[in-house]
Amino acid sequence: MACEGRTMISDTYKVRVNLGLCALAAAITLAGCAGLPDQRLANEALKRGDTALAERNYKALADLGYSEAQVGLADIKVATRDPSQIKEAEATYRAAAATSPRAQARLGRLLVAKPDSTQAEREEAETLLKQAAKQGQSNTLIPLAMLYLSYPQSFPKVNAQQQIDQWRAAGNPEAGLAQVLLYRTQGTYDQHLGEVEKICKAALNTTDICYVELATVYQKRGQADQQAALLGQLKSAYARGAVPATRVDSVARVLADRSLGQTDEKTAKELLEQVAPANPASWVSLAQLVYDFPELGDTDQLMAYIDKGREAEQPRAELLLGRLYYEGKTLPADAQKAEQHLQAAAEAGEISAHYYLGQLYRRGYLGNVEPQKAVDHLLAAARGGQNSADYALAQLFSEGHGIRPQPGNAWVFAQLSQANPTPQSAELLQQLDQQLTPDQRNQAQQLLDQEKRARGSLAQGANSTLALEALQDDEKEVDGEDSL
């Protein structure tokens, strides 16, 4: 339709916005003349991974004061996982929250995920999520459950299980998934596979994260027939646009996870190859798959996938490339190149990159042992959920390379590493137990309690797909164009 044909616009809008008729019509109808900001175009671009186009359109509308476009712009900043961008996103959400329930929900979720949050921020997150839920916003109860499970000391009057029971009794559709999250967090997931299956079968058509949970259940049980049927449903749902490419990627990673049982790496590769053109992050998942299962491709294929991931500015591609240079198996060892790529990944929010950087500095791969850098990066990794970083910290303080041995600190991190124990970490803890005097033990116990409080209580559940996606945008939410 030509711009001149848009004459049915109220005088009120003409007065409020001093723009030409064509620009104003584009901003309101969102069908848009060429080159003008368009929220529907931005929404569709974001879903297919074209963040540059989405950002341009969101920004143009956000500058006109549209709160839903401001939310979309902030969503893009959060997705970068860059701490500085996330800080900007928090400010943007906060500005829009006065008029937008979606912004309230986003800000609440962001505060739940915020490292080193204050008591005031946790209470604000609770208030925002409750307000957003009352106004019909989805994806609010699971973040609330995460908040209560992460910081029980901040909400002493709340019993997470009782709260979830109340939500389930009230028929809230998110309550079942909150229960699944609680099982993951408490380390009792394997004891409740039957209930997880029941919850997610009932919610599968409305909550596509359940594809990941059901795939996990069937993988753990070794139920190949049920897994095949589920994958058939997944492929059909993806083909008709009912499930996003990111969900297919998550299921593929379950199939390739050795810790869950017998893998099906070939099917995982087929799924990833199908969605990678629409979901650039899947190029990195393919690279990781070939790295884990070398029979699926040679080094050239691995590097081709990494290159595509880097072209799409995927931090996980930098992480994997840094690991290759760090390990020196697939590629020649090169500590300087490893540091370069790992730093890029760490700056973009990849927790594992801090672990490998810490090991670079702890082991002196760059020429000298740099203990303070090692501690900084390993602690960041450990507090971000990388359990192997705790063992590395225990080794660092125990061995004393470049620093004076500190058995008390070593004992603290050896204890923390027992969340996922190995024979090596258990042996080190036993040795340290014998070294400490009663006074040293008391001091170390105080440090351990302090570190546990700093980390919260979500160690086992925080990095699950369910937990991570609960803190991100809900792709099934109604797009914002109707409210503009």
UniProtKB/Swiss-Prot annotation:
Listed GO biological process terms: alginic acid biosynthetic process
Domain of life from the UniProt record? Bacteria
Has the keyword Membrane been applied to this entry? yes
In the UniProt record, which is one GO cellular component term? cell outer membrane
Q: How does it sit in the membrane?
A: Lipid-anchor
Q: Which Pfam families match?
A: Sel1
**Region of interest (Disordered), ranges:** 447-484
Residues annotated for lipidation of the kind S-diacylglycerol cysteine are: C33
Where is it located? Cell outer membrane
What is this protein called in UniProt? Answer: Alginate biosynthesis protein AlgK
